[in-house]
Design a protein with these regions (language model features):
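Acidic, glycine-rich active-site loops and adjacent beta-strand->loop/helix elements
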Residues: 89-91, 127-128
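Caspase-like cysteine protease fold
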Residues: 29, 56-80, 128-131, 135-174
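Short, structured coil segments at secondary-structure junctions
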Residues: 12, 57, 80, 116-117
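Conserved acidic residues
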Residues: 36-37, 82, 119
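A short, glycine/acidic-enriched catalytic loop
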Residues: 45-79, 91-104
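A domain-level signal for caspase-like cysteine endopeptidase catalytic cores
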Residues: 1-56, 86, 100, 104-108, ...
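Conserved short secondary-structure transition element at the edge of the structured enzyme core
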Residues: 106-121
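Short acidic/histidine-rich active-site segments
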Residues: 119-131
Length: 174
């Protein structure tokens, strides 16, 4: 998915930096170093995850062994992207309790980007089928770079996935 998105954007003249299969330090450095117009995050999302080596639970995107990209990491970004696409399972999920206990992150990545002022955020509200998620991302970006408005590009991509991937509910996750 990430390679396909990077290719689509590069073919339209966007300056693309990818961190595909990079380690945690490279990912975090790139996230904070550049002023991103479009930020596409693809990976596995976790909610209130804790491994044997972690002292507290974390919610966010897995970016390495026992390393989770959290809303706190996002909050430290110097610049606010215009568009953020988070294609991970569970990352659109909200904690209805609004927990503020030490070490517990009540917010998720999508919510943090919205709080920061990102103009448009796409995030999956539940676990998505990998193939359908990739197809959604490709359909969305194809339309965006062709000049369609954000809402119409999302609607049309959802429709495409509803038709193409009729046995999964991924179309409704975005």
């Amino acid at each position: 998915e990430a390679r396909s998105v990077a290719g689509t954007l590069a073919n339209e003249g966007y300056d693309v930096t990818d961190c595909i299969e990079e380690g945690t330090p490279v990912i975090l450095e790139a996230l904070h170093r550049e002023k991103w117009r479009i930020l596409h995050l693809a990976g596995h999302g976790v909610h209130e995850y804790q491994s044997a080596r972690m002292s507290v639970t974390r919610s966010g995107m897995v970016i390495g062994l026992d390393t989770i990209l959290t809303p706190g990491d996002i909050e430290q970004m110097r610049w606010v992207p215009e568009l953020v696409f988070i294609n991970c399972c569970h990352l659109g999920r909200m904690d209805g309790q609004g927990k503020t206990e030490p070490g517990v992150l009540a917010a998720n990545l999508a919510e943090q980007f919205i709080k920061m002022g990102v103009k448009a955020v796409i995030a999956a509200g539940w676990a998505v089928d990998d193939a359908a998620g990739k197809a959604f991302a490709e359909a969305f970006y194809r339309r965006m770079v062709a000049g369609e408005f954000f809402g119409e590009a999302v609607r049309a991509a959802r429709h495409d996935i509803f038709v193409l991937c009729e046995n999964v509910n991924t179309w409704g996750a975005y």
